[in-house]
């Protein structure tokens, strides 16, 4: 039995909100703005959310972590989770990453782009 089917049968009285979903990058600057791994991660996770909704799971929402790179309790500034890069060495200048543009398109269209 698949997880969505198990959920529908056993736990359908609860609503689901997926939150704090993130793909981290190292803070060494590698792929700091061109974050294709994050886009791939989001495609798979949002695709799974869509599949669950189509299967009848009552998903109420999805929250991406995070809008901007920030201080993480477990990692300090060594991991970057944001879809906007924060340059900690240059007055915290903010630069939208490729994932920002991709996620903006998804939100505006309310669907995942075709490959």
Q: What do the PLM-derived regions correspond to, one by one?
A:
Residues 1-115:
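Non-catalytic scaffold segments within catalytic domains of secreted glycoside hydrolases
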């Amino acid at each position: 039995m698949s997880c969505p089917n198990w959920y529908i049968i056993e736990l359908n009285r609860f609503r689901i909100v997926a939150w704090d979903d993130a793909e981290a990058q190292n803070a060494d600057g590698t792929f700091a703005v061109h974050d294709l791994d994050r886009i791939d991660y989001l495609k798979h996770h949002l695709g799974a959310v869509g599949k669950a909704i189509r299967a009848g799971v009552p998903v109420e929402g999805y929250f991406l972590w995070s809008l901007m790179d920030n201080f993480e309790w477990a990692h300090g500034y060594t991991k970057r989770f944001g879809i906007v890069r924060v340059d900690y060495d240059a007055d915290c200048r903010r630069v939208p990453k490729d994932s920002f543009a991709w996620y903006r398109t998804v939100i505006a269209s309310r669907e995942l782009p075709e490959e």
